[in-house]
Structure formats: C-alpha cells, structure tokens
C-alpha cells in the first residue's frame, strides 16, 4: 500500500473517531467542528463526568457508613409502619410558601443575571429547574449543594441550546432538611455567584 493510501486511510479513521466522539458529547461542549474543538470539548466533558463520579462515590460511601449494623432477618417492613417517618418531612415553613406562592403548584424562584432557579413541590419530592449559560463544572456544584442540604437526586435531565443549559432535577427531601423552597433556590443560586445581588421571588 502506497504512502498516499496509508495517509488517506488514517485520515478516514480519524474522521470516523471524531464523528463518534462528537455524537457522544453534549453539543454545548463543542463550539466548532474542527478537530481541536472536538477533542477539547470531549476532555472538558470527561473531566466533569469524573467529578460527578467522585460525588456519587462519596455519597455511596456515606450511605454505607450510615447503614444500621443490626440484622433484619429478612423481615418485611409494612408501609404503614413507616408512615410517621415518610409523611412528617420537616420541610420548614412550607405552609407560608403554600399561601404566598404565585405558581399553580407550591413553588418559589430565585433569579440573577447568571441563572434562573425554580423549585416546586411535587408530591413528596421537589422539582428543581435551573437555566443558565454553560459553565464547566457547574453541574457538580449544584449536586454538591443539594447533597449538603440533605436532598437526594432521584432524576436528572440536561438539555441545551447553543450556550444555554437547562438542568432538570427531581430530588427527595431528606429527613434532616429544614429549608423553605425560597432558601433552597437561593442556595442553588449561590453556587453560581458569591458577590452578586440575588433577588428571590415567590
């Protein structure tokens, strides 16, 4: 095989690899279609995934350490026996949120030039919607804030359009959580900025 044919085959394989990488990487990580932009975007995406894995592994370790050590003998726990624990969620001042909310559901929002954060009660969970420009590493920051506040992430969806990103969370309210919805949105907003003036509305 001639040198020209070898080079042509190498370029073809490289283009196929780049095409595969681009299809596996969210579009907002790749600003242009050239090789450097694709590889750079993939590296950023992998770094953020690695950070997310570290957060989840840390969460798993904490759950393991907090697991009761006494044996259960494979007994079945009836839902009725958990009623007090599952229904009395100490989500403080929820009554005030319910009476002042302008949403059709119980909700609050907190906006800044950097992000719009909205939280709503949905059954025993909270639906959190965050719209912002793309910031590398921001997803990990939000998840860290939620875990610090005793929320458990049940579902996460990410969508984007050019430089704008929408993070959609469904989170479970932890028994140790004592925040109102307004305080939750404010804490998430703080993960974006530290010195900006943040306006909270409900």
Curated annotation (Swiss-Prot):
Domain bHLH, chain residue ranges per copy: 1-49
Q: Which CDD domains match?
A: bHLH_AtFAMA_like
Q: Does this entry carry the keyword Nucleus?
A: yes
Tissue spec: Leaf epidermis and flowers.
Stimuli inducing this protein: By UV, flagellin, and jasmonic acid (JA) treatments.
Localisation per UniProt entry: Nucleus
Please give the GO cellular component terms listed in this UniProt entry: nucleus
One Gene Ontology term from the biological process aspect of the record: epidermal cell differentiation
- The primary location reported for this protein is nucleus
Give the UniProt keywords, A-Z: Developmental protein, DNA-binding, Nucleus, Transcription, Transcription regulation
Q: Name one GO molecular function term.
A: protein dimerization activity
Task: Outline what the protein does.
Answer: Transcription factor. Together with FMA and SPCH, regulates the stomata formation. Required for the differentiation of stomatal guard cells, by promoting successive asymmetric cell divisions and the formation of guard mother cells. Promotes the conversion of the leaf epidermis into stomata.
Quaternary context: Homodimer.
Question: What name is this protein filed under?
Answer: Transcription factor MUTE
Annotated source species = Arabidopsis thaliana
Name of the gene encoding the protein in the UniProt record: MUTE
